[in-house]
Amino acid sequence: MSGPRIAAVVLAAGLSSRMGSNKLLADFHGQPLIAQTVGRIAAAGVEQIFVVTGHQAEVIKQALASAKVRFVHNDAYASGLASSLRAGVAAAKDHDALLVCLGDMPLVNSADLKRFIAAYCDDRSIVVPVKDRQLGNPVLWGKAHFKTLLSLTGDRGARSILEENRERVTEVTVTDSGVLLDADTPEALEQIRESLS
């Protein structure tokens, strides 16, 4: 019997309003930040990667031209994170579980991602990384949670669903801080850039 079919949903539709420019296109050793993120997910052996685009969709597609991904466009990206999450879940709902990833987290360790996937046990599971007692990203969601994820609205992420289902959560402790670092500010972007040097 084969294992569960797990896909990744990479959220890459946002406006980067706190950054002044599209952070996903920031250069890291000749590669856009989004390509670094997707590359680490692919290296973990994820079956299929869905990239949700919105703002500057064509430029994001160009940045990932050599990546083996499926693009999902979110016309409502300006309404907030939840619309992108819904678009990704709807496109990938035939899978048993979804690894929901932020596009601006290029330091997530591929070995840690493999451990998250290995920790998945059934359709009600939620697998979350923990570093220094802080919950990180990405989060692996079993199929039983897809309907709830599809009901999110506004700029609300899925953290509230995680809190409401704590008995189904498997925490995977990691030593790498990449699960906590996303490029939400110019300072955070610089910290990530220094970490990749």
Predicted regions and their residues:
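Short, glycine-/small-residue-rich phosphate/pyrophosphate-handling segment
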Residues: 134-135, 139-165
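Nucleotide and nucleotide-moiety/phosphate-recognizing core
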Residues: 2-103, 107-135, 143, 167-174
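Short functional linear motifs
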Residues: 113, 146, 186-189
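Conserved alpha/beta core of the MobA/IspD/sugar-nucleotide pyrophosphorylase nucleotidyltransferase superfamily
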Residues: 1-4, 153-197
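Phosphate- and divalent-cation-binding pockets in alpha/beta enzyme and binding domains
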Residues: 18, 59-62, 148, 182, ...
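Activation segment
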Residues: 109, 149-150, 193
